[in-house]
Amino acid sequence: MKDSTEKSKPWGGRFQEPTNELVEAFTASISFDRRLYRYDIEGSIAHARMLVRQEIINRKEGFAIVEGLKEIQRDIETGSFEFSPGDEDIHMAIEKDLIRRIGDAGAKLHTGRSRNDQVALDVRLYLRAEIKEILEFMKVLKGAFLELAKKEAETILPGYTHLQKAQPVLLAHYLLAWREMLDRDESRLRDCYRRVNVLPLGAAALAGTSLPIDRAYVARLLKFPEISRNSMDTVSDRDFVAEFLFASSLIMMHLSRFCEDLILWSSGEFNFVEISDAFTTGSSIMPQKKNPDVAELIRGKTGRVYGNLIALLTLLKGLPMTYNRDLQEDKEPLFDTVDTVKACLQILAEMIRNMKFNREKMRQEAEGGFSTATDLAEYLVMKGIPFREAHGIVGKLVSFCIECKKELAQLSMEEFQRFCPVINEDIHDRLSVSNSVRSRKSYGGTACRQVMEQIRQIEEGAYPSTRRRKEA
C-alpha cells in the first residue's frame, strides 16, 4: 500500500513505494534554497496573473493564489512560517502551504510550468537583485579609493616590480590603480547582468507547453527585457551563474592583491601604513602583536570564491541535455560567493577609510634603492646616447654606487663623468624623486598633473573615455 506521505508529493502518482528516509534527507535543498522564497513568490504571483489573463484559471482562483502567496511571504519574513524537514525545496514548501491555506485553487498554480523553469527564474531574479547590491558596494569602495587618492595627491612612495624598488610614484596614482581594476570589475558585472536578465519561465520541463501561456506578459510583470529563445537551453543553462562566479573571482583577486600589499606595508619591515585598531586583532600569547586579520581573511576568502567557480564548472561539464538534478548543487557555491563578495567589499571600504600612511617613511624609501636610475638613462638618451648604451652606462654606475655604498644623487661630477663625459651639473635635478615623478607626464603616468586630471574626470563623470587625449 502506498505511504500517505508519498501521496502528498506532487510527483508521487506513479510511485508504489515510499521514498527512503536517507533519500529524503539526501535530496532535500530546503536548508539552503529557502533564501529564494521572495523570488519564488514574486515569480509565482506573476505566473498566476498570467494564468488569469489567459483564462487558464478564473479570477477568483487567481486572487486566492496571489493573496495566499503574499500571506506566506509575510509569515516567512516574520519567522512564523514553519519549514518541514519533508519539504524538498522552497518551491514545494510554498506550494504545499498554499494548498493548505486556500485549497484546490493552490494546486492550479503550477499549471503551465515545471520546477525546471521555476528554479531558473528564481535564481535569475535572485542574482539580478544581488548584482545590483554588489554594484552599490563597489561604488562605495571606489569612492573610498578616490577620496584617499585626493588626500594623498602629493605623497611619494617607491613603485615596485618583482617586489623590488623600481621607480618613485605618487600614492594617489597607486590608489587609483585599484579603482581602475574595480572599474573593469564593474563593467564585467554589468555585462553579466544583461545575460542574467532574461526570462526563463515558460520553458516548462524542457519542451515548452501546449497551454496558451503569454511569456511576454510575464516578462513585463517581472521587468525582464528579454525572453529565452530555446526551451531546452533555458532549463539547462547555468552559464549566467558561472559568469557571475568568474566576475566575482576577479573582484576577489583584486581585493586580495590590495590586501597583500596592506599586509606587507603594515609590517615593521615596511612601516608604510597603519591599519586602525578596529580592523586588526592581537595575539593570545604575544602582547606586542597587531595582526592585519581582516586583510588576511579577504586574501583567504578569495580561494574560497575560486573554489566555488571551479565547483560549478566541474558540475556543469558532464551534464547531458537538459535538466539534471546535479543543478541543485549550483546554489550553495552561488550563495556563498554572493555573501563573501558583499562582506569583503563592505569591510574593505571601511578599513581603508581608517588607514594612516607613513608619508615620511614612504618618501625615505623612494629616495633609496636607485629608484631614479631610469631617469638617469633617459637623461642620457636626451643627450643623444642610444637607450641600450645608456642602460649599460647606468648599470655600471649603479654597481659602482653599491661598491661605494652611495646613492646616485651622492656621486660627484667627477665620478659621473668617469662613466659618461656628457653628464653635467643638470643631472642632480633629474635624480630627485620629486622631479622624477613630475617628469612622468605621459597620459596615464604618475605625474601630478596626470593624476589630478584622472581624478577630475572621475568626479565629472567623464571617465573612462575612448577619446584620444592630448598628452601634457
Swiss-Prot record:
Primary localization class, coarse: cytoplasm
Superkingdom as given in the UniProt entry: Bacteria
Single GO MF descriptor: argininosuccinate lyase activity
GO BP annotation list: arginine biosynthetic process via ornithine; L-arginine biosynthetic process
Keyword Transmembrane helix found: no
Enzyme class: lyase
UniProt keyword annotations, A-Z: Amino-acid biosynthesis, Arginine biosynthesis, Cytoplasm, Lyase
Location in the cell: Cytoplasm
Listed pathway(s): Amino-acid biosynthesis; L-arginine biosynthesis; L-arginine from L-ornithine and carbamoyl phosphate: step 3/3
GO cellular component: cytosol
InterPro entries: Arg_succ_lyase_C, Argininosuccinate_lyase, Fumarase/histidase_N, Fumarate_lyase_CS, Fumarate_lyase_fam, Fumarate_lyase_N, L-Aspartase-like
SUPFAM superfamilies membership: L-aspartase-like
Reactions it catalyzes: 2-(N(omega)-L-arginino)succinate = fumarate + L-arginine
Pfam families with a match to the protein in the record: ASL_C2, Lyase_1
Keyword Transport carried by entry: no
Annotated disulfide bonds: none
EC number of the protein: 4.3.2.1
Coiled coil: none
CDD domains: Argininosuccinate_lyase
Family: Belongs to the lyase 1 family. Argininosuccinate lyase subfamily.
HAMAP family per UniProt: Arg_succ_lyase (MF_00006)
Protein name from the UniProt record: Argininosuccinate lyase
Organism the protein comes from: Syntrophus aciditrophicus (strain SB)
Record gene name: argH
